[in-house]
């Protein structure tokens, strides 16, 4: 095990230095409490990061999409991340990942965690940001604007992996969980930030691939925040085959009675898949949901277990 400590009591004082030192895997990096102001990238399989505790072990940075680059261009969404992992069999426990750039209206997108690979696990982690907090790669098949995908996986194969988020706290405003991966969220809190708009937040914006069985599945999660009543949306489709299923989730009064938004893509009514089962809270108003939102039977909900979605 490698130990990171800001006070010099470990093997390294920087998380990235510890990662770079790894010559054989599997390897575990223990990170003592501290504020680690750095960007961290992981490209090696079979690495585990363990923080001392989620409130005290913080990896933070403040890059953002509107940030000017030396060549006169903007940094863009996919080069704004604080933490980047493109690997398989990765685990993170008890860590806060933060992008502190601020509200999207001022800085644009600002990713805290950019996660791509298969068998990625985040447990008891905090992911703090505003617009586009958590990106669950891969990217969509095609960009809509030239240069829109500039970043570390722009030319990587588009292979959706399996990701697990358990007992995590994820905050943001616009589309703060987005991407094409197969993700299972268990006992997580999604916290929407008020930006004083008619619609303050879209919790999720999946870009699930056509023909992919699963997209985002949330089990026993809470959708909360500090927004006025009926001013948040559970999801909207970044791409038209988006899939989101909520199982026994608690939906606060902040959630709009319609719950889901089509992003002005009426064709998505026939192609996306939004569904709920046995949810609770003032934001769960099934009779007001759009016709394209499904209310599952117990048998149908049985297709969305952790084992079936994540694989174990």
Segments (PLM) and residue ranges:
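Sequence-level preference for short, compositionally simple segments enriched
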Residues: 1-312
């Amino acid at each position: 095990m490698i130990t990171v400590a800001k006070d010099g009591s470990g093997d390294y004082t920087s998380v990235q230095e510890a990662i770079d030192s790894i010559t054989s895997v599997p390897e575990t990096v223990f990170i003592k409490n501290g504020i680690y102001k750095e960007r961290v990238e992981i490209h090696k399989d079979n690495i585990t990061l363990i923080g001392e505790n989620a409130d005290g072990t913080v990896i933070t940075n403040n890059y953002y999409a509107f940030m000017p680059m030396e060549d006169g261009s903007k940094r863009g969404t996919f080069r704004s991340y604080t933490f980047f992992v493109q690997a398989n069999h990765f685990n993170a426990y008890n860590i806060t990942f933060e992008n502190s750039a601020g509200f999207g209206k001022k800085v644009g997108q600002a990713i805290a965690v950019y996660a791509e690979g298969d068998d990625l696990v985040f447990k008891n982690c905090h992911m703090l940001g505003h617009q586009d907090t958590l990106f669950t790669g891969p990217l969509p098949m095609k960009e809509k604007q030239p240069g829109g995908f500039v970043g570390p996986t722009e030319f990587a194969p588009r292979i959706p992996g399996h990701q697990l988020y358990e007992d995590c706290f994820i905050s943001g405003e616009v589309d703060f969980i987005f991407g094409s991966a197969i993700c299972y969220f268990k006992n997580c809190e999604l916290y929407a930030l008020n930006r004083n708009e008619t619609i303050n937040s879209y919790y999720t914006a999946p870009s699930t691939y056509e023909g992919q069985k699963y997209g985002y599945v949330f089990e026993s999660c809470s959708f909360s925040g500090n927004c006025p009543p009926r001013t948040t949306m559970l999801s909207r489709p970044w791409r038209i085959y988006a899939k989101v299923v909520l199982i026994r989730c608690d939906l606060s009064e902040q959630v709009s009675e319609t719950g889901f938004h089509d992003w002005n893509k009426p064709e998505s009514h026939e192609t996306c898949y939004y569904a709920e089962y046995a949810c609770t809270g003032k934001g769960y108003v099934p009779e007001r949901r759009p016709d394209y939102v499904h209310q599952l039977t117990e048998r149908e909900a049985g297709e969305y277990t952790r084992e079936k979605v994540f694989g174990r």
